[in-house]
Amino acid sequence: MNKNFYNNFNDNNMELDFLTNDNIYDNMNNNNVNNSLDIPLIDEMSEKNDKFCKLMKKRIDGLKIIASSCRKNNTEDAIAEVGYLKDLGIANDYLNYSLIKKDIKLIYLNNDEVLKLFPTILLLLESKYDNYFKTAFQSAFVILKLYQNIIIDAKTCAFVSGVDLNREDKLKKYDKIIDFFYRIRISSKVAKNMNKYLELQNFLSELDYFLKKCK
């Protein structure tokens, strides 16, 4: 788990405010405090600890499933578990391992897997953490490199008369992929950080070309 692990509790609505509540420490240091006042405090801390332990167990169980799926090269199950957990720390680590740091020649994602990944990428893109934002656009850049020529060719090739259900299904999925890329392009976070990362500028340059070709 990375260094942002504890920050992520707020992302999961897990507020650990009892650790920073000055009133609690004032009460604990007050020798004249009525013992009856300690009981709600203990109950509150026990409840928070219980939530913490449950969240930890959920994360560990999820990581086991993801790790097992990766060992078996079962990308679909790994992506599904990442999406189910909605844990940005785990998603960030998974995308770094499976997409960004991997040789692009060794990456294969089918249409359905890409579509399942994009909601997670969009969540990371809008995160307040810079490293999550960077992971998001780098992952999107990898997917763009994998798919841009395939989608452009499919969208621009001459229409063949007759019904081709397989082609129509692919085009519908390609349209959804294009829509996700468009949502990334108009993101206020992307506009705000445009001059911060050279790689982001390169990504946007290729993305603009791709979106123009797909109109």
Give the residues covered by each predicted segment.
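Eukaryotic intrinsically disordered, low-complexity regulatory tails and linkers enriched
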Residues: 1-48, 213-215
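Alpha-helical solenoid scaffolds in large eukaryotic transport, assembly, and signaling factors
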Residues: 36-215
